[in-house]
Amino acid sequence: MRASGAVVTAGEPLKLRVASLIDHLDQKVFDAIYSRSLVYNTCWEDPAVDRQALQLTSNDTILVITSAGCNTLDYALQAPRRIHAVDANPRQTALLELKIAGIRGLDFEDFFLLFGHGRHARFRDLYGDVLRRDLSSFAQSYWDKNGAWFCQEDARDTFYYFGLSGMVARATMPDKPK
């Protein structure tokens, strides 16, 4: 059978080609989304369960997917020898870097306003005076462009409502959080 100049055969090979095409398109969509935005702004897993199961010690070196950095920081509570946080999306690593810079340079109240509430009226000052110097050049560039996510006044416009997870939250939560 001919369609638009291509030879098309019915049966199993056609099913495999369609499945392959769907997989290809799925990967293209994933790559387009994942390579252009912060996907995870918080983690939903329970790393305490992992810590209990792994029984990490000071002799351990672990490899984790960075995601939003929450699990990486939780594993650090066990003080393993080294943690390697990797992610295909460098924006996730930029978020972990920002959190580490905050842990090192901010008091609890400022850190919690940033990452507990997702906003801080003085973010630009804190970023310029304290946080930025501890970031890689990629993370600096990323947060130079996206730091406004932490400067919003409206509860629906906090850091947690930006990036891909934030878009999903906006779409699924009809009412603003209080």
Model-derived features: where do they sit?
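Conserved alpha-helix/loop element of class I SAM-dependent methyltransferases that forms part
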Residues: 38-61, 74
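N-terminal, positively charged/glycine-rich alpha-helical extensions of SAM-dependent methyltransferases
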Residues: 2-32
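Conserved SAM-binding loop of SAM-dependent methyltransferases across substrates and taxa
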Residues: 68-80
